[in-house]
A protein has these predicted regions:
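Compact, charge-rich alpha-helical regulatory domains located at protein termini
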Residues: 23, 143, 161-242
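Acidic, metal-coordinating catalytic segment for phosphate/diphosphate chemistry
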Residues: 19, 315, 319-422
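Residues that scaffold, gate, or flank divalent-cation-dependent active/transport sites
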Residues: 1-108, 112, 237
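Short, conserved phosphate-binding/catalytic loop or strand-edge motifs used
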Residues: 108-114, 151-156
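DNA-contacting surface of Y-family translesion DNA polymerases
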Residues: 9, 201-346
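Short acidic, glycine/serine/threonine-rich loops at helix termini
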Residues: 19-22, 45-49, 155-163, 205, ...
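Catalytic palm subdomain of template-directed nucleic-acid polymerases
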Residues: 113-134, 163, 207
Length: 422
């Protein structure tokens, strides 16, 4: 167990929408604003909805057309770089109180803070320290925050997600006893961290609808239904979580992969899809070279247009030897694409993944690859990386990037698939 640990989980309320309100001089808690790209169709997803709209029943991740027509609101195009700048400034606020070793950033708008060793220093309770940090964030950036306080990471997160939003000061505390008292009978289970609809459906089929019922269920039945994941489910039902921030920071995954995915702006024909996949492969190659890595396995998933009910095309290929050469990898990717994709079907979604990634020190050459050609490829890629880092991602382009159906130039101006605003 965690002994006497105490954590804060701080969330920036409707972060993207709040930033846009602050930039316009509006109160983030009262303004009606959604963050969505007006250049896309009404089916585009709202990246954020301001708290005032949420109170009127507008869900956070709705599509634009789902917002009731009778509700007036302003739309702000996403500016991802601006949000990153605000998040960095708020991280600086955390560092005024807590060392970076005790901070775990969960997402751009949420972070866990291990405040165990700081309460005596500041002569405060965890709730008091949480309030102080929230106020500092508000004073520094005008962004409102909420805070969960808990005796482990799970309880801090649940206190934030389920309880803090009902408190006038947007802060709530949970320990194991309080959790069982307040939330054991809470419904729906999807309100709890890491409990998805599929899990709830399987639990419901077993006659289980609350955390209390999970806690008292026969463990053998839970393990039969959920396998090793039952251990996490049982721990969380009792309000237990043994993992600490130090454990998270010390964790190193056994396997590394590089992935790129995009939803195309329209239905793409077969040959147009080849172009986009090769662009994606080329950019992933640069990522490999930049980090001194090579890959030995490629996976590709193609989602077709909704015009026809085709199942997604999925395939993979293993390379004869690991490489980061764009010439070799683009050839493999194109062969894989032509092997799995229907020539007459329209394409809408593409996901490309390089797996079996290792450091280039382990690279071996086979009888069919030319070491000198590969080294020449990698040197050219390193030069391209250097130019892009100095002059911008569109400073050096290939002929294929200039074709009408290409997406690289536009995507280079995005962060996370959305406009950077720069």
């Amino acid at each position: 167990m965690n002994g006497n640990k105490i954590y804060l989980c701080i969330d920036l309320k409707s972060f993207y929408a709040s930033v846009e309100c602050v930039e316009r001089g509006w109160d983030p808690l009262t303004a009606r604003l959604v963050v969505a790209d007006p250049e896309r169709s009404e089916k585009t997803i709202c990246l954020a909805v301001s708290p005032a709209l949420k109170q009127m029943g507008v869900p956070n991740r709705c599509r634009v057309f789902q917002i009731p027509k009778e509700i007036p609101y302003k739309m702000a195009p996403p500016r991802m770089q601006l949000y990153i700048d605000y998040a960095a400034e708020i991280y600086g606020v955390y560092l005024k109180y807590i060392a970076k070793e005790d901070i775990q950033v969960y997402s751009i708008d949420e972070a866990f803070l291990d405040v165990t060793d700081y309460l005596h220093l500041y002569q405060m309770t965890a709730v008091e320290l949480g309030r102080k940090i929230m106020q500092d964030i508000l004073d520094t950036t005008k962004i409102p925050a909420a805070c969960g306080v808990g005796t482990n990471l799970y309880l801090a997160k649940v206190a934030l997600d389920i309880m803090a939003k009902h408190e006038t000061d947007r802060i709530a505390y949970l320990d194991e006893a309080r959790y069982r008292e307040r939330l054991w009978k809470h419904k729906p289970l999807t309100d709890f961290w890491r409990v998805g609809r599929g899990t709830v459906e399987r639990l419901s089929n077993m006659g289980i609808c609350t955390m209390e019922e999970i806690a008292h269920a026969r463990e053998s039945l839970l393990y039969k239904a959920f396998g090793i994941d039952a251990e996490l489910l049982i721990d969380h039902a009792w309000g237990r979580e043994p993992v600490t921030i130090a454990d998270i920071k010390a964790y190193r995954p056994k396997n590394t992969s590089f992935s790129s995915g995009q939803v195309l702006p329209r239905d793409y024909e077969y040959e147009e899809g080849v172009l986009v996949v090769k662009e994606m492969a080329d950019l992933l190659c640069l990522d490999l070279v930049d980090q001194g890595l090579v890959t030995s396995h490629i996976s590709l998933t193609i989602g077709y247009s909704n015009q026809k009910c085709f199942e997604p095309a999925k395939g993979s290929t293993t390379l004869r030897s690991a490489t980061s050469s764009n010439r070799r990898l683009l050839s493999y990717v194109e062969q894989l694409y032509r092997r799995i994709v229907r020539p007459g079907a329209y394409i809408r979604r593409i996901t490309l993944t390089y797996t079996g990634v290792m450091t280039e020190d382990y690279q071996q050459f086979d009888l069919f690859s030319d070491p000198e050609e590969t080294e020449k490829d990698v040197k050219a890629q390193r030069a391209a990386i250097s130019i892009k880092q100095r002059y911008g991602r569109n400073a050096i382009l290939k002929g294929m990037n200039l074709e009408e159906s290409a997406t690289t130039i536009e995507r280079n101006g995005q962060i996370g698939g959305h406009k950077s605003g720069v």
